[in-house]
């Protein structure tokens, strides 16, 4: 039986729409997921289409947006690609990789996407919704929209917002960010651009990120309710930076949480950075201060440098070379510097990058084979097929411990025999997952394909202690709460803050 015929049998979905990008949809959905879980419901997150290079890999090897994975954690369930059936991964120049149900199926321009991919995209969304309900008949979907639901030039091709809301007859909440100003115009303008049948789906309004005394907005609340005839179901206070950023823009603007830093970490801000959630565990370390490196400079003030993942490794390596950052990194390594490269960062630390199929940002034949930074004797070739999988392994360095994480990459990395005099060692028992090299003057150069490596508490703590030892700082022997437990604690705090100020009763009937 088709899902449409069974909609009267399912629990009414809750959909969170926003007046703009960055209004707070992702965190609102995350909070609602945990609130409903705590109330004994079976929430499941859903976002029909997401555009992000911050990805997660589920246990079937399917790619999905990290924000939906985080929402699944809030629900107490394993992430699955059907929670985000369409993922678009920007590659620059208005080109994106298209991922359906976790699998890469090609690339497209923005113009061609709306022309050629709309119908198959809608079918994938409906297929995912049907699968979720068949496997979880008692669940309540908590759905996230994207951007604004009333982009009038795109609304007839919008797969993520009102089309999904109408299909499921969802109870919708409209979220707006008062921190940015202009909430009255945003709310009224958004509602006025909706058709009458769409506006009827909006059952509540949330004012997000309110600073100061909430009672000072009482007159504003009454005005909105009188003007729209829709209740303001929540005025959420401004929450500090301890909650996860929603997208890459938020991340770059985010300040380090450390109040008493003993270790200073520099992360290279690549133009095509991906999987920035890799650094969340470091953000939550009390003794670590993180700074983003955007331009050429003397790097000696940093205790270690991270080269993050990249969606366009060739393009980003050319940026590093042209900007002078490649030389800065090489100079840093000669001065007892410690460096960690993750995925694309690992590849760039090698000697050679070859892109025969133009998969990683090479624009012409002269860019198909370029030099890497040259700190590890490794060469990488990018192939058409992408490897996506969950990882369970054991580390050899800097400690022996169980390791979990995931891989997402096209490149295959092997030892560069011409540079084999640069001795390297495997980091893991699965030797193709990462390598490290100790400098003669001190410091280590390490690279791994494992995203989420810093989520492994023992590995992270041993690496940090390696850095501390190089600074003659005492070893941290604390058996601290694990990062994954801390992530749950952060989600609980988020949900508790929302629950204090959000009335969901009318949405649970």
Curated annotation (Swiss-Prot):
It comes from the Bacteria. Pathway: Cofactor biosynthesis; adenosylcobalamin biosynthesis. GO terms for biological process: cobalamin biosynthetic process. InterPro entries: Class_I_gatase-like (IPR029062), CobQ/CobB/MinD/ParA_Nub-bd_dom (IPR002586), CobQ_GATase1 (IPR033949), CobQ_N (IPR047045), CobQ_synth (IPR004459), GATase_3 (IPR011698), P-loop_NTPase (IPR027417). GO terms for molecular function: ABC-type vitamin B12 transporter activity; catalytic activity. Transmembrane segments: none annotated. It holds the Pfam family CbiA. Keywords: Cobalamin biosynthesis, Glutamine amidotransferase. The active site is at 343 (nucleophile), 451. Residues 262-459 form the GATase cobBQ-type domain. PROSITE patterns: GATASE_COBBQ. Catalyzes amidations at positions B, D, E, and G on adenosylcobyrinic A,C-diamide. NH(2) groups are provided by glutamine, and one molecule of ATP is hydrogenolyzed for each amidation. Belongs to the CobB/CobQ family. CobQ subfamily. This is Cobyric acid synthase.
């Amino acid at each position: 039986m088709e899902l449409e015929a069974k909609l009267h049998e399912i629990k009414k979905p809750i959909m969170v729409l926003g007046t703009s990008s960055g209004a707070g949809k992702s965190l609102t959905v995350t909070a609602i997921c945990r609130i409903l879980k705590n109330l004994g419901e079976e929430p499941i997150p859903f976002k029909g289409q997401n555009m992000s290079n911050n990805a997660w890999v589920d246990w079937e090897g399917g790619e999905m947006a990290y924000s939906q994975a985080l929402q699944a954690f809030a629900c107490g369930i394993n992430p699955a690609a059907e929670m985000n059936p369409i993922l678009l991964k920007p590659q620059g120049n208005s080109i994106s990789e298209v991922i359906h149900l976790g699998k890469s199926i090609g690339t497209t321009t923005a113009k061609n996407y709306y022309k050629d991919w709309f119908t198959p995209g809608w079918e994938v969304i409906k297929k995912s919704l049907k699968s979720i309900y068949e496997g979880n008949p008692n669940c309540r979907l908590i759905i996230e929209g994207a951007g604004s639901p009333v982009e009038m030039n795109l609304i007839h091709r919008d797969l993520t917002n009102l089309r999904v809301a109408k299909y499921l007859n969802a109870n919708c909440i409209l979220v707006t960010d008062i921190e940015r100003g202009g909430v009255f115009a945003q709310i009224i303008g958004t509602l006025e651009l909706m058709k009458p049948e769409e506006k009827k789906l909006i059952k509540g309004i949330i004012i997000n990120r309110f600073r100061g005394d909430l009672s000072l907005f009482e007159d504003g609340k009454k005005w909105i309710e009188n003007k729209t005839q829709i209740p303001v179901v929540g005025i959420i206070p401004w929450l500090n930076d301890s909650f996860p950023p929603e997208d890459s823009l938020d991340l770059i603007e985010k300040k380090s949480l450390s109040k008493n830093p003993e270790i200073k970490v520099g992360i290279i801000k690549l133009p095509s950075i991906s999987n920035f959630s890799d650094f969340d565990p470091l953000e939550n370390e009390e003794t670590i201060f993180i700074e983003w490196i955007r331009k050429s400079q003397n790097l000696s003030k940093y205790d270690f440098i991270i080269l993050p993942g990249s969606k366009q490794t060739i393009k980003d390596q050319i940026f590093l070379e042209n900007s002078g950052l490649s030389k800065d990194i090489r100079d840093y390594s000669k001065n007892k510097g410690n460096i960690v490269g993750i995925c694309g960062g690992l590849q760039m630390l090698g000697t050679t990058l070859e892109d025969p199929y133009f998969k990683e940002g090479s624009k012409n034949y002269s860019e198909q084979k370029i030099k890497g930074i040259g700190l590890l004797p490794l060469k990488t070739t990018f192939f058409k097929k992408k490897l996506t999988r969950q990882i369970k392994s054991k580390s050899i360095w800097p400690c022996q411990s169980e390791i979990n994480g995931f891989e997402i990459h096209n490149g295959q990395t092997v030892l560069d025999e011409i540079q084999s005099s640069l001795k390297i060692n495997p980091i893991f028992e699965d030797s193709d997952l990462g390598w490290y090299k100790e400098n003669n003057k001190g410091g280590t150069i390490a690279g791994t394909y494992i995203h989420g490596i810093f989520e492994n508490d023992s590995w992270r703590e041993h690496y940090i202690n390696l850095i501390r030892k190089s600074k003659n700082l005492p070893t941290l022997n604390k058996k601290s709460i694990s990062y994954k437990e801390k992530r749950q604690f952060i989600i609980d705090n988020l949900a508790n803050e929302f629950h204090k100020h959000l009335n969901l009763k009318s949405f649970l009937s």
